[in-house]
Structures are given as C-alpha cells and as structure tokens.
Amino acid sequence: MGRSASLLRLRDPAPLPTDIAPDPAEAPPSPAADRRVIVVTGMSGAGRTTVLRALEDIGYEAVDNLPLSLFEALTQGRWDQPRPLVLGIDTRTRGFHAATVLAAIERLVAATGFDVRLLFIDCDDEVLVRRYTETRRRHPLAVDRPLADGIALERALVAPLKERASRCLDTSILPPAKLRAVIEAEFSLDHRPELAIFVSSFGFRNGLPREADLVFDVRFLANPHYEPHLREMTGLDPAVAAYVAADPDFAPLIDRVTALLALLVPRYEKEGKSYLTIAIGCTGGKHRSVYTAERLAAWLNETGRRAHVRHRDLKETPR
C-alpha cells in the first residue's frame, strides 16, 4: 500500500437510498459532536504512553490497548461525543496485526466519515536499547530473546503502520517534557496549534543537535573557560552571565538574532510549522551558549510566545 499524507480517507460513506427514511439511531451526529479520532501506535519505549497522557490532559478521551474487536464497535450507532477520541494500539494489543489495524481504520472511515489519523511514535534502536537498559523494563517482544532482537522484530511488525501514518514523530532526541510540549502545541483543541519553540544550548565538541532548525555559533565571544574563577561555573551563574554580556560583540549579536527571529517566527507560524528548535553553540556548551540561550528564550517569552529552554550538555532539567 502507498503512503498517504492524510490517512485512509478512501471514500465518503455511501448515501442512503432516497426512498428509505433514515433510522433515527443512525442519524448524523449532532453539530457539537467531535468526529476526530487519533490512533497512536509505534515502537515500545518510544513514548507512546507519554503522548496518550499529553493528549488526555488537553481534552482528548483516551483509551489504551483497546482490543481490535472492540475497535470495530466504533463503526456502530450514533457518534455524539463532544471530545475527540485517541486510541492507543501496540503489539501488546489483543489481536494485533498491522493489516488488521489498517483494515479496521478503513472500515471506520468508510462507515462513519470520521477524520481518522494515525500517529506513529518512533525512536532510534540504540536509544530504545539504552532506555530499556536504564529502566530495567522488559521489552514486550524480548521475553525469550535478546533485547535488540525484540526491537528488530517489533519494527518489522509495525512497519506497515509507519508507512501509512499521517504523522511520524521521532522521539530519539525529545525528553518527555519536550515531547509533551510538541503534542500540546500540535494537537491543541482550544485554538489553532501554536508554534512550540525550543532554545537549546550545546557544545560543538559533542556534535550538532540533530533536531536543530536554526543554529547559531557564539564561539567568537570571549570564553569564560579561560578565567580561573569562572571555569567551574556555567552560563546560569550571574558572574558568567555578566562576563558574557560585557563582551562588546554580545549586544550586537542579540540584536541581530532577535531581529532575524522577529522576521522568521511569524512566518513559521503562518505556514503551520508545529515546532521550532533554535540551537546555540559554543565550544563545550557550558558558558557562552547557555547564557545566550537564556537571553533568547527570555526575549521570545516577552513577545508573548512560549519558549522552552534546554541545555543539552549541562545536567539540567528542560523547562
């Protein structure tokens, strides 16, 4: 089956014969009904449960591991729920088979005309191995085989779902707080989804952040590392902040970067971009990039947007 940008809207429901009055029990849903359904699936350990909880917190009705036999019940009767529905399905679901899941979704769309979307949560294999190793949880398909083999088997089983997904979300570089923010921004029910903005400091010696949309190199600023009394501090400490801010190149840098963001951010919002990651890099990701990221995030928040800060190479909780 080919890839579909808008999942499985194969055909409209067949019209009722004109000479037969519709059964009241099969009447169309009330205008207040919400006909959206999101089916969340993907790799075990990738964050599917976090996504379900985030959707539930913003107003979706969430059902996890619904047996596929009960999934079929959604095609029956009248739909008058005021909240959209999110269904969690994975390889532990009773009767799971990718072809069965896709067929059930097709029948649901054909019988009801619901706006059904498949959200696939993915993650790199090496990250999954690390997550399972660190938490000491057992992978559902690695009960009698090595962890890596269980992950490989699951990836093969869910491959058809990933191919047909409306949206694939890779969580390899998304900590839980950032994943929740992405979901809240993209699937908000209260208003047009807002642009979720993340400002991340990093050290070039540890590599570029894979998730970065915009990268700014601040290694030209004076380096606090060479000041013995500042070396063990970070850009979160007032003394380091004052040192970086005193560099005569710092103010022009902030002026030009904020001017660029003032141009770009509204245009990203207009085109419907879901999230934007701005990465600020210095040599070690400890001093200059940290303070610069804090300043840019503060400016973004002052403009009325919500910017989340993460210091990749500091042992710091994202916020």
Curated annotation (Swiss-Prot):
GO molecular function per UniProt: ATP binding; GTP binding
Binding site for GTP: 90-93
Family: Belongs to the RapZ-like family.
Region (Disordered): 1-34
Keyword rRNA-binding on entry: no
UniProt keywords, alphabetically: ATP-binding, GTP-binding, Nucleotide-binding
Entry coiled-coil feature ranges: none
Name of the protein in question: Nucleotide-binding protein Rru_A3448
HAMAP family: RapZ_like
One Pfam entry name: RapZ-like_N
Keyword hit for Nucleotide-binding: yes
Function field: Displays ATPase and GTPase activities.
Binding-site list for ATP: 42-49
